[in-house]
Amino acid sequence: MHAPQPITAATGEAGEDRALRYLQARGLAVVSRNYRCKGGEIDLVMRDAAGALVFVEVRARVARSTQRFGGAAASVTPAKQRRLIAAAEDFLARQVEDVPACRFDVIAIDGARIEWMRDAFGVDA
C-alpha cells in the first residue's frame, strides 16, 4: 500500500480557492485567508448569514489516494484540531472586539468531490 501523495503548495492553494468559491456561493463572506500565528494557521475565516465566525480547514487529496487512507476529512486529526483551535483563539484575541458565535468547519476535497462538514469539531478537541 502506498502512502497518499503529498499535496503541493499549488494544489493546496487551488483547493482553498475552490473551497472559498463554494462557501461564497452558499452565502458565507470571507473575513480572512491564511491567518497565521505562532500556534498554527487557519485556511479561511468566514462569516455566515447569522453573523457567526466560521473557521474553515480545507483538506484536499488527489483522487487516487483518497479511499485507501480515509480521504481528506480523516486527515484533520485531534492534534490538527488543537492547532486550529489555538489559531482561532489568537485570531479572536487580535482581530475581534466582541466575540460572536463561532464554529469550526471542514471542507474536504477528494478529487472532484467537495464535502462541507459544518461544526466538524468543538473546542474540547
UniProtKB/Swiss-Prot annotation:
Gene3D superfamilies: 3.40.1350.10. Pfam families: UPF0102. GO terms for molecular function: nucleic acid binding. Belongs to the UPF0102 family. NCBIfam families: PRK12497.1-3 (NF009150), YraN family protein (TIGR00252). This is UPF0102 protein Rpic_3463.
